[in-house]
């Protein structure tokens, strides 16, 4: 029987509860207990929403007070020395100091660098790697949230950034550091301890996210991946280990990925449609489960369910249906909660939208179609097809006047580069390699003072 899962869920709250609670904590208007209570209420609401929608395996530890990569940094104790952390469990003040920087009379430390999470608009905090760095379990968040979910009867699937991707996403602080050498080895040791504890807690599946596998990887890097998972597999006990990829296809890494000693592989079948060709070309290992990411987790539009079902049926010719899990293509972190709450929007456009809650329903519908046949979901398929057709032909999408203007511009002759260059130089006066900023600067006391003095 085909089951369903998600890879992650929005965090901020339907009414931005997390934003308000965090800002109140930072301002000193409420304490840590109130912030933690808000987090617990949001987690419960998110788990219950997914269970009510019919999702079988529900992610846990996808929730974060700030950033999931920062949570991984705390888990392994990769706290830079400037925060004066002494190896104990990472507390909220240290956690937020890494996220936002800290300026006190006795301590002035900038935040960790922030950069884009692959090609999304989400930004993550960049781990800092040092020569001789040592790691140890320094946060109980992962285990606490698993226990929290289990107490509610949730079929919990713990989710972590995988150690291979975590090592690559970090930034070496000097040239001696080898991210896939001593750093990865240290991370694997701590992740092994974490897997031991999760297995003891009785979880069924453990999801390790390895999005770096959708980037080109060298033979040496894939060897490091293979060695890392050979070690991790010895710690999973009775739990099943899932390596989850997203944001594209895995390309030449497919065969190495498929051969890892794990129980499941997650592939993006939306932005990584080439993964379907890889499945057909190379097959899929017997006994393993495929998490088929078929509902787009990154956009706000309804899925064309008939087209998505055709892709799943194609995949099912390679992977037996009892070893298929239907899922979004990535975490639903990137979309809002509920499209039905959008009131100030054109009714036609609103009918094309699917936010997190609607995408849960789409995942469940596709799972049901594979289990019971197309006839069982005929009404859903028809409504989806009608919405897709309407959107494809709507004047909201296709404006004849714009098309005509663009056609005229394409027909106009453009001046040769040799003529445009001196005109641009005269008007703009830019150097050969102009630079700019994206508007983000470290929030040190000196920067804050300078900015305040310039406001007039």
What are these regions (language model features)?
Residues 1-456:
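Domain-level signal for soluble alpha/beta catalytic cores
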């Amino acid at each position: 029987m085909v089951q369903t899962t998600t890879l992650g869920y929005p965090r901020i709250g339907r009414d931005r509860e997390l934003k308000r609670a965090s800002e109140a904590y930072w301002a000193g208007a409420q304490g840590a207990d109130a912030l933690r209570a808000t987090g617990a209420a949001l987690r419960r609401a998110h788990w219950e929403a997914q269970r009510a929608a019919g999702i079988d395996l529900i992610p846990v530890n996808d929730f974060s007070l700030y950033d999931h990569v920062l949570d991984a940094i705390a888990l392994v104790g990769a706290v830079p020395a400037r925060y004066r952390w002494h190896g104990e469990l990472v507390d909220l003040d240290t956690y937020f100091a890494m996220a936002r920087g800290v300026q006190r009379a006795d301590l002035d430390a900038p935040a960790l660098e922030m950069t884009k999470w692959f090609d999304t608009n989400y930004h993550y905090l960049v781990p800092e790697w040092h020569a001789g760095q040592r790691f140890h379990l320094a946060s109980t968040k992962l285990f606490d949230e698993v226990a929290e979910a289990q107490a509610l009867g949730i079929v919990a699937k713990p989710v972590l950034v995988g150690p291979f991707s975590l090592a690559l996403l970090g930034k070496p602080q000097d040239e001696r550091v080898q991210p896939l050498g001593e750093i990865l080895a240290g991370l694997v040791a701590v992740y092994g301890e974490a897997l031991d504890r999760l297995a003891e807690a009785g979880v069924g599946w453990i999801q390790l996210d390895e999005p770096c596998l959708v980037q080109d990887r060298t033979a040496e890097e894939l060897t490091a991946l293979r060695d890392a998972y050979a070690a991790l597999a010895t710690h999973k006990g009775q739990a099943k280990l899932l390596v989850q990829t997203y944001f594209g296809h895995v390309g030449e890494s497919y065969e190495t990925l498929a051969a890892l000693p794990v129980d499941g592989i997650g592939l993006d079948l939306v932005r990584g449609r080439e993964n379907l060709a890889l499945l057909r070309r190379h097959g899929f290992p017997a006994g393993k489960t495929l998490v088929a990411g078929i509902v787009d987790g990154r956009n706000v539009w309804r899925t064309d369910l008939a087209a998505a079902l055709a892709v799943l049926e194609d995949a099912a010719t390679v992977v037996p249906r009892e070893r298929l899990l239907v899922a979004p293509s990535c975490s639903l972190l990137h979309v809002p909660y509920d499209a039905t709450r959008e009131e100030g929007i054109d009714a036609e456009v609103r009918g094309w939208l699917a936010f997190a809650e609607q995408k849960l329903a789409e995942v469940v519908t596709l799972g049901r179609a594979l289990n019971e046949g197309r006839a069982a979901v005929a009404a859903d398929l028809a409504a989806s097809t009608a919405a897709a057709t309407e959107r494809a032909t709507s004047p909201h999408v296709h404006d004849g006047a714009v098309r005509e203007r663009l056609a005229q511009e394409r027909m106009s002759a453009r001046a040769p580069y040799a003529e445009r260059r001196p005109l641009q130089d005269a008007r703009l006066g830019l150097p050969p390699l102009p630079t700019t900023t994206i508007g983000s600067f470290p929030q040190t006391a000196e920067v804050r003072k300078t900015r305040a003095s310039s406001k007039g």
